[in-house]
A protein has these predicted regions:
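Residue-level preference for hydrophobic side chains embedded in well-ordered alpha helices
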Residues: 27, 31, 35, 56, ...
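A short pre-motif secondary-structure segment
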Residues: 134-138
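Sigma70-family region 2
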Residues: 18, 41-46, 54-72, 91-93
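Internal acidic/polar
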Residues: 2-7, 87, 94-122
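Amphipathic, Lys/Arg- and hydrophobic-enriched alpha-helical face
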Residues: 28-46, 63, 124
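Arg/Lys-rich amphipathic alpha helix in sigma70-family domain 2
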Residues: 62-69, 79-99, 113
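DNA-recognition helix of helix-turn-helix
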Residues: 86, 140, 146, 152-168
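N-terminal module of bacterial RNA polymerase sigma factors
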Residues: 1-34, 41, 145
Length: 168
């Protein structure tokens, strides 16, 4: 994220947070919306997204010693989010179906805000996973093409091409 006037950079905040975890609060406020939006589109419910987002920030705080500033903080925390989302689905694979939980999800009354998200999720499921991931990282995590390329081990031009094809 860009430098804020009269505020420390992300790298400075990360370094300060290693000694004083309270300094992590500003990083949290800068990135909570970005991380939450990214997670929300990839998990079944807003409650799951809230829980996962909290775990992601807990993990980031405990792993700050690994952040060296080689990439932007936003790239680093979204990488953590990708891993936690994968863990979330691995854990769910072993869960059994609970009929009571299914009944709760089918309760009448659809929130208007959920319609847009459901539509986006449906459209993303129609894309091949690699294209959907690029769209999610670009649109919901607000990462640049070069940051996505760095994260996925591809060139910026390749990511631009994938994103362009996915948006057609």
């Amino acid at each position: 994220m860009e430098q804020y006037e009269d505020q420390p950079s992300d790298l400075e905040l990360a370094q300060m947070s290693r000694e004083n975890p309270a300094a992590f609060g500003l990083l949290y406020r800068r990135y909570i919306d970005t991380v939450y939006r990214y997670v929300l589109v990839r998990v079944p419910s807003p409650e799951d997204a809230e829980d996962l987002t909290a775990h992601i920030f807990e993990n980031a705080l405990s792993s700050l010693h690994r952040f060296r500033g080689d990439s932007r903080f936003s790239t680093w925390i979204i990488q953590i989010a990708r891993h936690r989302i994968a863990d979330f689905y691995r854990a769910r694979r072993h869960d059994t179906l609970d009929p009571a939980a299914l009944d709760e999800r089918e309760a009448p009354g659809i929130a208007p805000d959920d319609l847009g998200l459901d539509t986006v999720k449906e459209l993303l499921t129609r894309l091949p996973r690699a294209k959907a991931e690029v769209v999610e990282l670009r649109v919901f995590a607000d990462l640049s093409h070069s940051e996505i390329g760095e994260m996925l081990g591809k060139s910026e031009m390749a990511i631009r091409a994938v994103f362009s094809r996915a948006m057609k």
